[in-house]
Regions:
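Catalytic beta/alpha-barrel core
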Residues: 1-10, 79-80
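Short, charged, surface-exposed secondary-structure boundary motifs
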Residues: 11-17, 37-40
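Short N-terminal helix-initiation segments at or just after the protein's N-terminus
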Residues: 8-14, 73-76
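Intrinsically disordered, low-complexity regions
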Residues: 9, 154, 173-181
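Terminal or standalone catalytic/regulatory effector modules within metabolic enzymes
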Residues: 176-192
Length: 192
């Protein structure tokens, strides 16, 4: 099970974390507290660290915590992309937690959002993001995620990529498969 969610607010920590422990669930940790959502990534890291430490007090391991670092809109905050990439990297390397990002948050208010979201996803994955909240029906987003998997070595032998994008030879007028470079069996037989 995955509990959605706990924040750094004391009353939420006291209510949610015992339930997470009782049921052996994982939990989404939102990087805000009583002061709200900070634009400062160091503050959001500190809130996440507080949640992870409190969860440890209940015996909840870091690997069962999925931190949402709260992606800010790049159209409003110029450095939002750089900040969240650094924050995701810190969460993964220093706190050893999983992360999730609302991919479309970064492109809020901008045109051609899918292009921005696709770029964001590949960079966030390279920074250590382990999951994302995104639309799996947008081809550009799917292609970006799959290409990042290839580049990061998460798609051995590019098998998923090839399976998804390899073109099937077209049928000829006679109903037989087209004779591309790969289909040499008939030619060899004829030459013998």
């Amino acid at each position: 099970a995955l509990v959605n969610s706990v924040t750094g607010e004391e009353d939420r920590l006291e209510t949610v974390l015992p339930l997470v422990k009782k049921y052996g669930a994982a939990v989404v940790a939102i990087s805000n507290d009583e002061t709200g959502i900070s634009q400062d990534p160091d503050v959001r890291f500190a809130v996440a660290k507080k949640i992870v430490e409190r969860a440890a007090d209940y015996g909840i391991p870091a690997c069962d915590i999925v931190v949402d670092p709260l992606v800010m809109p790049i159209g409003a905050i110029n450095q939002a992309g750089v900040q969240v990439m650094r924050l995701v990297h810190r969460l993964r390397t220093e706190l050893k937690v999983n992360t999730t990002c609302g991919a479309s948050n970064v492109s809020f208010g901008l045109p051609e959002r899918n292009g921005i979201n696709a770029g964001f996803l590949t960079m966030a994955m390279a920074s250590g993001m382990t999951s994302a909240i995104t639309n799996p029906l947008h081809a550009e987003v799917v292609r970006a995620i799959m290409s990042a998997d290839v580049m990061m070595g998460h798609d051995p032998d590019c098998a998923r990529w090839i399976r998804k994008f390899r073109e099937v030879p077209a049928m000829g007028a006679d109903g037989e498969m087209g004779r591309g470079r790969r289909d040499t069996s008939n030619r060899r037989r004829r030459e013998s």
